[in-house]
């Protein structure tokens, strides 16, 4: 898991979990050190353009990527988008996506809830997902569950619609 540095020097640690294979298969990139370097570069991407470049390099060097490599790229795009929103985790499984908000007592959580990030996210979710989501509070963390997603593509589309290119993350000054 990589942290993504925002212009205000706050770090959002975001992880993405998917229930489909999301990796560079050994038969596709045979050299283990090369696979490691490719994983590292992808985890350090901070823009969609960097992910696009990584994906193009993969195709140029190793040929058409298998579905597992495509899934890895989709997960990286989801991570980038979720980090900009201020989410700590995104889980996609069984045609559903769970968006995990930060813990209320954490530095990130205090800013997220007190400065309007949560309210922005909630209103964007209502517009993007309609009645197909529910809010679950678990301990000091809030989760949004979105149902009716057919693929990682549809999960990413929902996440991008919620993000709408505008960050709901409220940076923490250090």
What do the predicted segments below correspond to?
Residues 1-174:
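Accessory helical-bundle/CTD segments and flexible terminal tails appended to RecA-like ATPase motors
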């Amino acid at each position: 898991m990589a942290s993504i540095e925002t212009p205000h020097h706050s770090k959002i640690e975001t992880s993405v979990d998917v229930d489909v294979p999301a990796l560079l298969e050994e038969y596709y990139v045979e050299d283990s050190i090369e696979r490691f370097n490719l994983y590292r570069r992808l985890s350090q991407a901070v823009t969609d353009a960097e992910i696009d470049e990584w994906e193009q390099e993969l195709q140029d060097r190793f040929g058409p990527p298998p579905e597992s490599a495509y899934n890895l790229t989709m997960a990286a795009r989801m991570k980038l988008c979720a980090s900009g929103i201020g989410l700590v985790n995104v889980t996609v499984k069984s045609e559903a996506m769970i968006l995990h908000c930060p813990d209320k007592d954490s530095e990130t959580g205090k800013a997220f809830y007190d400065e309007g990030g949560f309210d922005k996210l909630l209103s964007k979710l209502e517009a993007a997902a309609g009645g197909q989501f529910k809010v679950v509070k678990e301990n000091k963390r809030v989760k949004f569950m979105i149902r009716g997603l057919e693929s990682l593509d549809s999960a990413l589309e929902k996440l991008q619609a919620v993000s709408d290119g505008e960050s709901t993350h409220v940076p923490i000054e250090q």
